[in-house]
Amino acid sequence: MVAHAEIKNLSFVYADENEKALQHISLSVQKGEFIALAGGSGSGKTTLLKHFKKELLPIGKRTGDTYYDGTLLENVPDLLSAQEIGMVFQNPENQLVMDTVIQELAFSLENIGLPSHIIQKRIAELISFLGFQDLLHQSVHTLSGGQKQLVNLAAVLVMQPKLLLLDEPTAQLDPIAAKEFLGLLKRINEELGITIVLSEHRLDEVIPLATRVICMNNGRIVYDGSPKTVVANMWEVEKFRPFIPQIPRLFLEWNAKDIPFTVREAQMKLNDFLAISYVSEPIVQSEKQEVILSAEHISFQYEKNNPLILRDLTVSIEKGKWVALVGKNGTGKSTLLTILAGLQKARRGKVKWNGKVIHKIDSKERFKSIGYVSQHPYYHFTFDTVWDEVYERARELYGEQGKEIAEHQLKKFWLYGLKERHPHDCSGGEQQLLALCTTLLSKPTLLLLDEPTKGLDPWKKERVGELFRKLQKEGTTIVMATHDIEFAAKYVDQCMMLFDGAVIMNDAPKEFFSGNFFYTTSINRFIRKELPYALTWEDVYEACQNDMLHS
């Protein structure tokens, strides 16, 4: 049987680079498969995905061949490629080109010359399948991140593709929107028979849906097989263990024979007579510190007649604390961070830092002492190479020592090998690290971070978490907006949930997540009855070794 898509002995090196991005890749994709691509940031996942669609082939030197339905990729007709091979990218903003949702859906169909009655029929049928009729005539600029990504997916599906490629499509979505999006992909795969190849760091949600997992490292495929086989292989190698989702990781630590991937499967394996002593874990209250940053009665809207994004919001941040702002896309987390940083002025209310109104602080002092990283790190970049980006800032701050400091900083953030690369050619995770790297050069005492772990693989995420903890011990206060609730549960001191422009929940992670039904970690959903305050596999493992399993 001819493979749906096939890659034979593919190697690739980007223009102006020496290191190979892909090395001797061979794989075949069968019709109807749901393949999850796993691996570290910069391991070659995005580069590999782009080699399935000829319009996206990166510029550089390649050897080897790619086939689509038995035809060499470069010989596949343009119209066929446009219709049958679709791709959804990480950033929802980057693919939207029209003003309204219906225009966005019609755009690609008009480009391939379909008559208007066929376009109308296709859109009507697709909208009925996806169920978002209420968004059809809305401006794309008013949509939340989750809705924008849904529109991107719909704009690809309306072409009726046979192969769907997705590059970390949930990276900027809140946990509930991400779950819905991935569930929709599974439905598309099962009900429409569309083949899916998906690169994703959120393996907790993806692995239970996938029929096959491919793990990459340094441009090579290291594991390829069923989810259970690949996870078992990853467990054997220490450096791949952080990539294993929380529930299977816990059961592997317990040396269980049959590894569950979902909450339901895991609960079926629990012992019914779990010792009651595990249930009520006391919460240790941390000492109160002085308030270093406060927002008092903040209200904000972008345009005068637009609805308020923040309404009469008041928050206090204590010195040396690490605070996570969580909540759905569009609840005002990013807006609040820019107001706290003094980059935008509230319509009403005021922000104080160290007792001073933020806008009355000298802008030079503010820029040096307050480090802000946007959720779109490429907004920070002004130079043509990674090296210049870091070196020029280091030289500005430290003069002759700048070169040595820049080298040290790049090595610390795993970016030294990319120093000659253009920042915009870096992966999403690498861009995130570069923005963080340059921001930390001035040793700010307040860090305001918008999605700092976005695009980072689990291993780098752990290292960044440890770095932030070290900065905390040195007196740095950290406020981050995040959709990564597993990361927040493991590292932060305090969680605040924004909803309808206000803070509706504010607590330490254990109390915060244990009180939630949907907005919590997979481990907490699995074992909340027995261990209400357990949020990570480490929490459960420390509480009890393996006596929770059925014998």
Swiss-Prot record:
Subcellular location: Cell membrane
Name of the featured protein: Putative ABC transporter ATP-binding protein BA_3364/GBAA_3364/BAS3118
UniProt source species: Bacillus anthracis
Major enzyme class: translocase
Similarity-based family: Belongs to the ABC transporter superfamily.
Domain of life: Bacteria
Short name of one Pfam family: ABC_tran
Membrane topology: Peripheral membrane protein
Principal location listed in the UniProt entry: membrane
Ligand binding (ATP 2): G327, K328, N329, G330, T331, G332, K333, S334
